[in-house]
């Protein structure tokens, strides 16, 4: 429970029709009433709006406002909350805030309103983080995922898993503490193994969907690679329908990364055009090539571009080898030239590349671009998204805790195979239970809570 009253501007600072100053604390209504000319706010009902004026210290009018009152416990923070709807100018908003802070009210820390809502039991940690995700959403899918978190679908996943784990721990502990009681159901290693197998399956399913949700929310980091002059920059420009990257017949034109974003049927592709990889004596081009090779390790998808108008070159073969263990799609560019040189050369090289692996495209007339987009979505299992698919995690912190829980169960499986004593099993079960608890904020450390909420904007 907090005893001080806090305030902050909740709307973006700038010129607009209305700005909102949010005030929270058990004394917030009484304090704002001291500087308000209009109906007595202490006597208003909760969830009501009152017209009036904010007064200066000399009792002159500072601004004409609408005051929204939300009384505990039915407010965002769980405390008494007042929202002052003032005129939206930068100066007048700041002056109203300063007048509020002249009372027994202090400026809120970033995220403190949401932190109070969490600590007062108005939301769990997933819901709090979903608010931040909603504010920073960059596409429609990210909004849907955030709404799923706010509606507690993901919280229910965690709660269900924890209930199953707690029930299993309880059965084990009862059998250890009271082995002599005949009316207590006996827990066997076989039964524990079946329960653990089911929990592992559930966690693996959650992880699979959560990884997809991360792509839905954040997009796919996509590296465009190839030897010089195969049309990498032309491909980037074709995606965007604009000249983002310089296109030239001179090899080595692109020496640094050129980045852009493309909406691939609802999925964001973070496209990165890279320096063409080849042997060169140019020191600047060498730096670009080295950076490209490092970026290969960070890419979530590689678009390897080959030139259909040329036979497979040694540099192409080296790139095919370099990227063979990475998620990649091979593109045959310049399809508009109607050349079969690339395909005809496949049988005479060591690349072991089959013609059907190549998606034929033209950066000039957009031939094959729809097929390329569909191939990308299919590769990441994003080609048939259903509403229920959004009811999983996308936050890296949540996914990490799911992975910790999964590893605990995998360790438990090994202990079961080795027929270890039954009391040992509770150790891994407890680890998994605590890892999942970290997601919703159960027994969360204060330092982590402060860190999470400090990332929120002021006034939220």
From Swiss-Prot:
GO terms for molecular function: GTP binding; GTPase activity; metal ion binding. K(+) binds at residues 229, 248, 250, 253. Keywords: Cytoplasm, GTP-binding, Hydrolase, Magnesium, Metal-binding, Nucleotide-binding, Potassium, tRNA processing. This is tRNA modification GTPase MnmE. Residues 219-381 form the TrmE-type G domain. GTP binds at residues 229-234, 248-254, 273-276, 333-336. Its EC number is 3.6.-.-. GO terms for biological process: tRNA methylation; tRNA wobble uridine modification. The keyword Oxidoreductase does not apply. InterPro entries: G_TrmE, GTP-bd, GTP-bd_TrmE_N, GTPase_MnmE, MnmE_dom2, MnmE_helical, P-loop_NTPase, Small_GTP-bd. It is found in: Cytoplasm. Mg(2+) binds at residues 233, 254. GO terms for cellular component: cytosol. Binds 1 potassium ion per subunit. The keyword Cell cycle does not apply. PROSITE patterns: G_TRME. Belongs to the TRAFAC class TrmE-Era-EngA-EngB-Septin-like GTPase superfamily. TrmE GTPase family.
